[in-house]
């Protein structure tokens, strides 16, 4: 009987750990819903296969990355419309050129979704890509993950500024610093515009 009781307690303890991990991971990230539309109309059928997992990879990147331990209750909802303009081959490397629109949204009392005040149009997006390539959060510059980080910082900063005056400054600074690294990298396309954008919004 004691053995059965112990086994039952162990079962519930494991269940508790699973629940804690699932809900704990939700609690410490800044984005709670990410909707992605990948537009590949300009690509051939063969090139489209390269992006079979990209929508889900970007979604999971935003949902599971902790962009800051200091702000974990933002519950941001964003829509991303990513247009893949072209895919080119250079040796063993595949280069993707794209543009994107990112907007934040909010659930209304009636359950409908309303587009809020943040609207970012990104052009000159360029990054290397391959099938099965995972998007990993890193402090080093990476053309794809750094692009996603930049707009995460911008969206978080803009949201915090609605809470309190200049509350988002540290995140605008992170966007500026990331843009500096982008400008000095071998994948500098578009980063000068992002640098100017972050500084302009920060100083307004």
PLM feature spans:
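Start-of-domain marker
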Residues: 30-97, 108-110
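N-terminal, helix-rich and Lys/Arg-enriched segments in bacterial and organellar proteins
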Residues: 12-13, 48
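Sec/Tat signal peptide C-region and signal peptidase I cleavage site
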Residues: 25-29
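Acidic/His-rich structured neighborhood in mature extracellular/periplasmic domains
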Residues: 97-203
């Amino acid at each position: 009987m004691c053995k059965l009781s112990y086994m039952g307690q162990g079962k519930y303890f494991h269940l508790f750990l699973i629940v804690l991990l699932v809900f704990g991971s939700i609690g410490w990230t800044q984005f709670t819903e990410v909707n992605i539309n990948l537009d590949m109309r300009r690509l051939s059928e063969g090139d489209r296969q390269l992006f079979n997992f990209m929508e889900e990879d970007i979604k999971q990147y935003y949902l599971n990355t902790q962009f800051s331990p200091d702000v974990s209750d933002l519950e941001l909802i964003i829509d991303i419309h990513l247009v893949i303009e072209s895919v080119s081959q250079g040796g063993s490397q595949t280069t993707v050129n794209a543009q994107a629109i990112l907007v934040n949204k909010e659930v209304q009392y009636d359950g409908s979704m309303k587009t809020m005040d943040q609207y970012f149009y990104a052009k000159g997006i360029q990054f290397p890509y391959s099938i099965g390539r995972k998007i990993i959060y890193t402090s080093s510059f990476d053309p794809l993950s750094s692009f996603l980080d930049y707009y995460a910082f911008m969206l978080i900063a803009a949201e915090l500024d609605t809470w309190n005056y200049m509350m988002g400054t540290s995140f605008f600074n992170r966007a500026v610093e990331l843009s500096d690294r982008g400008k000095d990298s071998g994948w500098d396309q578009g980063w000068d515009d992002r640098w100017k954008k972050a500084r302009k919004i920060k100083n307004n």
